[in-house]
Amino acid sequence: MSNEILYILLPDYAAHEIVYLSQAIASDEFALKENPKYVNKAVAPTMELVKSIGGFRTLPDYSFETMPDDYAALVLIGGFGWTTPVAEQVVPIVQQAIEKGKIVGAICNGASFMAKHGFLNAVKHTGNGLEQLQLWGGHNYTHPDGYVHAQAICDKNIVTANGSATLEFAKELLLLLENETPERIEMYYQFNKQGFCLLSGKQ
């Protein structure tokens, strides 16, 4: 199995939703890892620069046509691109990932996209509220009873989260990937959730 984590970035993607996960993959609290267990790779519709909501431009490692068939995880980063026709090109990518038992993460509108195409019908899940999942999903979303009102949920290799849950999303994926020990992942989560001053006892 490849050790690459593939991040799907559509035009106007939400850059902040990548940060906690990708940083923990590539570094520890002191420096870049010399031999990381996984490697971050950006995937976009083409090899052209893809722009974030905030205006940052990312040069992708792969396009939809050149991305590998084997990888460790597929992560759908939220943003406004999921409401556009280009998002439909991601349907077979996700379908293949689920069929192969790959780890799939989807946050914010990425989770709504999953609902729209019936990918959440066999798992417990969350997202930007049940109403949005039903609005996006229509008749294809048949599992509202599986919705959990939580920041992030992991079930059967699928992790979903709402757009405010970037840290919780990262935590669930890091645990599923076994990127570090559960204790170190919890430490990373608490440090970023609580903040240095609170954890160090300083005012």
Residue ranges and their predicted role:
Residues S2-A14, Y20, S27-T46, F56, ...:
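Active-site-adjacent pocket-lining segments in enzyme domains
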